Amino acid sequence: ETLAAKRCAFIVDHQQYHGKIKELQGAYLPYDNEEKILVCTPENDFNAGRERTGMGVLIARALQQNLLKDREKAEQSLREYHAFYLRELVNAATGLVCNCSGKDNSYFRLYNYPWAVTFFLECWKLWGEKENLKTAVRITEKFYEQDGFRFYPIEMPIVMLCQELEKAGEQEDLKTVRDLFRRHADQLIEIGTAYPASEVNYEQSIVQPAAEVILQVYEVTGEEKYLRGAEQQIAVLELFDGQQPDYHLHETAIRHWDGYWFGKRRVFGDTFPHYWSAENGRTFKRYARLTGNEEYNIRGEHSLRGVLSMFFEDGTATCAYLYPYSVNGQKADFADPYANDQDWGLCMNLE
């Protein structure tokens, strides 16, 4: 909680754009911890959309949990980001989520949809404004209109959306999204372990979404076939984790090249930790809660805590830790200077 509070304060004070470019007004952007400046380019992994949504989700969750000292300042910042999101990234009427500010969707990417759903859900939970809940539903519907049934989305908030629609008395929307989620889980069960390639050919964050989607649908429906389907995926997911006595590695899913794509140094190599590793922890803890298997609860907690080393005492953060001593003859073993997309790691710890 202390790390989250300091991180949120840093984002509000240092990572929100208030300059002359109208298109970026209110955006949360990557930050260069060496030069102490904001970073934004049209390049996918450094733009004002996509994974950077995690900063908005983090601040919304921290506000709900009363973690922030200057609540008024943080809430005003989030309002500005919310306005940016609606103005530059999302068509709230249709549910379209764009890849970059300026409503630029020249690069089509389904991964952006569940993050937008999560952001608007957290805003609904914080402010109680029904339009945010409705927007989350429209984005979900748009995701599935674009063949989302065969996609492996990271952070699709199935249970949360169903719960919030139930609380709000939106029974028609609840039935609609439940049917969509069920079809998605059925499709992933049918595919089984014959995983299709995504942005990379095969990785932990293809297997984990399969397990998580199916397991969440089990939580929503109680149908045993979804538990069995999720267990098939979890058996594969476990293969990405080790139990080495090193905080970089223990229950940290193997990932590689994330520092190259999202970092300043652009170095290839294994990233231990990388924040998406903690997605395994989310799935393990959900499985433990639904089955009573305490071993998975412990493993899940270790996985979630494993990414906290990416956040520092002064509120700064790193997008990845390059674990090898050297990569292609270049010295590694360092935390990349860019704070970029890592805040999902804290979001998971506040969930």
Regions found by a protein language model. Give the residues of each.
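An acidic-aromatic substrate-binding cleft motif
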Residues: E1-L86
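Extended, well-ordered alpha-helical scaffold segments
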Residues: L3-I11, K69-E88, W127-Q146, G169-G192, ...
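Acidic, Ser/Thr- and Gly/Pro-rich intrinsically disordered linkers and low-complexity segments
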Residues: E34-V39, T94-D104, A197, L249-V267, ...
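Short, charged/polar micro-motifs that form catalytic or ligand-binding hotspots
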Residues: L38-G49, G102-L110, V200, D270
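Well-ordered alpha-helical scaffold segments within catalytic/enzyme domains
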Residues: E51-R71, W115-E129, E145, E155-L174, ...
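Helix-terminus loop motifs that line ligand-binding clefts
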Residues: K69-F108, G242-E251
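Aromatic-lined, polymer-binding surfaces characteristic
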Residues: V90-L180, H184-I191, Y195-L215
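Terminal, non-catalytic domain-edge segments
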Residues: R183, Q187, A210-E351
